[in-house]
Amino acid sequence: MQPITTEIVSRTIIKRPADSHKGNYGRIMLIGGNQNFGGAIIMAATAATYSGAGLVTVATDPSNFTSLHARLPEAMVIDYHQTDTLLNLLAGMDVIVIGPGLGTDTVADQLLTAVLAATHVPQRLVIDGSALTLLAQQARPLPATDIVVTPHQMEWQRLSGIAIKDQTPTANHDAQQRLGVMAVVKAHRTTVYTDERVWFNPGGTPAMATGGMGDTLAGMIGGFVSQFHNFTDAVLSAVYLHSAIADDLAATRYVVLPHQISTRIPTYMHRFSQIERP
């Protein structure tokens, strides 16, 4: 295993050109948030927005519209029950994040199937939360494009068939190879599995053990892969920065909340963008 290093982050997060516009930094759609779990998609969308995604669209249950408008006025919202509208918009997206707060009912299952069928190269796909449970319950074809799954250990057990106690780096890497997608397995020391190697995140703190932390990471990953060309480096940088911010906050806090991480993402990205490169 290799550690995710600050060198990876600093070569990924670069200064923005002076003539930039929002179209340069990716169009991202985040899909999730049923009537009971609207907070999950709000936290994911917040992280994507603060990570610098150019245009953010949230497809969610209408019960979440008011909260989304109030908490994140930068994001556009659509009703995820209107499948035709969703798929028409999805065709123009650079990145799709599906799963935070999605649930596992029939509506969620049909939505996941439709999104997987519609996603295409060169779009990038982040699969998180409930969508991973649905994939574990029923295997279905995955699009031939850049995909990252972001399971915690129990979700990885369902998806890979490997019991938590047996989730060694070797076993996990074998499972990742079979699945054919990048895997971010969240644990005390999160590990990232690519076709070529295994990475481990040196950061992380028990202060992060609270609901919504994974939703925030999924949104960060979506925001990073929407604007940075190297898919692997973008994912690794999001994983690293998510924990690095939390570690700094935990120096003076017993608990770190997801939104506290999100609001600090631009500051940390700016810091890395200022590092002089050879």
Swiss-Prot record:
<keyword id="KW-0456">Lyase</keyword>
<dbReference type="GO" id="GO:0052856">
    <property type="term" value="F:NAD(P)HX epimerase activity"/>
</dbReference>
<keyword id="KW-0521">NADP</keyword>
<dbReference type="GO" id="GO:0052855">
    <property type="term" value="F:ADP-dependent NAD(P)H-hydrate dehydratase activity"/>
</dbReference>
<dbReference type="Pfam" id="PF01256">
    <property type="entry name" value="Carb_kinase"/>
</dbReference>
<comment type="similarity">
    <text>Belongs to the NnrD/CARKD family.</text>
</comment>
<feature type="binding site">
    <location>
        <position position="215"/>
    </location>
    <ligand>
        <name>(6S)-NADPHX</name>
    </ligand>
</feature>
<comment type="function">
    <text>Catalyzes the dehydration of the S-form of NAD(P)HX at the expense of ADP, which is converted to AMP. Together with NAD(P)HX epimerase, which catalyzes the epimerization of the S- and R-forms, the enzyme allows the repair of both epimers of NAD(P)HX, a damaged form of NAD(P)H that is a result of enzymatic or heat-dependent hydration.</text>
</comment>
<feature type="domain" description="YjeF C-terminal">
    <location>
        <begin position="5"/>
        <end position="272"/>
    </location>
</feature>
<feature type="binding site">
    <location>
        <position position="40"/>
    </location>
    <ligand>
        <name>(6S)-NADPHX</name>
    </ligand>
</feature>
<protein>
    <recommendedName>
        <fullName>ADP-dependent (S)-NAD(P)H-hydrate dehydratase</fullName>
        <ecNumber>4.2.1.136</ecNumber>
    </recommendedName>
</protein>
<dbReference type="GO" id="GO:0046496">
    <property type="term" value="P:nicotinamide nucleotide metabolic process"/>
</dbReference>
<dbReference type="GO" id="GO:0110051">
    <property type="term" value="P:metabolite repair"/>
</dbReference>
<dbReference type="GO" id="GO:0005524">
    <property type="term" value="F:ATP binding"/>
</dbReference>
<keyword id="KW-0547">Nucleotide-binding</keyword>
<feature type="binding site">
    <location>
        <position position="103"/>
    </location>
    <ligand>
        <name>(6S)-NADPHX</name>
    </ligand>
</feature>
<keyword id="KW-0520">NAD</keyword>
<feature type="binding site">
    <location>
        <position position="152"/>
    </location>
    <ligand>
        <name>(6S)-NADPHX</name>
    </ligand>
</feature>
<comment type="subunit">
    <text>Homotetramer.</text>
</comment>
<keyword id="KW-0067">ATP-binding</keyword>
<dbReference type="InterPro" id="IPR029056">
    <property type="entry name" value="Ribokinase-like"/>
</dbReference>
<dbReference type="InterPro" id="IPR000631">
    <property type="entry name" value="CARKD"/>
</dbReference>
<dbReference type="InterPro" id="IPR017953">
    <property type="entry name" value="Carbohydrate_kinase_pred_CS"/>
</dbReference>
<feature type="binding site">
    <location>
        <position position="214"/>
    </location>
    <ligand>
        <name>AMP</name>
    </ligand>
</feature>
